[in-house]
Amino acid sequence: MTQQSPYSAAMAEQRHQEWLRFVELLKQSYAEDLHIPLLNLMLTPDEREALGTRVRIIEELLRGEMSQRELKNELGAGIATITRGSNSLKSAPVELRQWLDQVLLKEA
C-alpha cells in the first residue's frame, strides 16, 4: 500500500477543494446571519485572535506609517508574521489592495 505524499498534486487539489467548500459555507452563513456562530465553531479563540492581528498588520502596512519592527512591538506579533503579511500584500491583486484601502483605511 502506497501512502500519498502530503505534497502531491492530488492532495493539493483536495485541500483546495476543501478550502473552497469552507468559503462557500461561510458565504452561505453570512446570507443566513449565522456567520458568527459558524466562525466560533470552526476557529479556536487563538485562531480568531490571530486573524484579528493579521487584519491589523495589513491595515498598518497599507497605512505605511510604521516600520515592520515598530509594528512588531505594537502588536506583539513575530517579525516573520509581519514579513509574510507584507510579502502577501505586495503580491495581492491591485483590485484587492484598492478594496482593502477603502475598507480598512476609511475615516472612522
From Swiss-Prot:
This protein is called Trp operon repressor
* Oligomeric and partner information: Homodimer.
* One of the record's GO molecular function terms: sequence-specific DNA binding
Task: Extract the DNA-binding region annotation as residue ranges.
Answer: 68-91
Q: Which key words tag this protein in UniProt?
A: Cytoplasm, DNA-binding, Repressor, Transcription, Transcription regulation
**What Gene3D superfamilies does the annotation carry?**
TrpR-like
The record, for SUPFAM superfamilies, names: TrpR-like
A Gene Ontology biological process in which this protein takes part is: negative regulation of DNA-templated transcription
Q: Which is an annotated Pfam family here?
A: Trp_repressor
Instruction: State a GO cellular component annotated for this protein.
Output: cytoplasm
Repressor as UniProt keyword: yes
Any keyword Hydrolase?
A: no
Principal subcellular localization:
cytoplasm
Q: Which family, according to the similarity comment?
A: Belongs to the TrpR family.
* Location of this chain's protein in the cell: Cytoplasm
Q: Which InterPro entries does the entry mention?
A: Trp_repress, Trp_repress_bac, Trp_repressor/repl_initiator, TrpR-like_sf
Role this protein plays:
This protein is an aporepressor. When complexed with L-tryptophan it binds the operator region of the trp operon (5'-ACTAGT-'3') and prevents the initiation of transcription. The complex also regulates trp repressor biosynthesis by binding to its regulatory region.
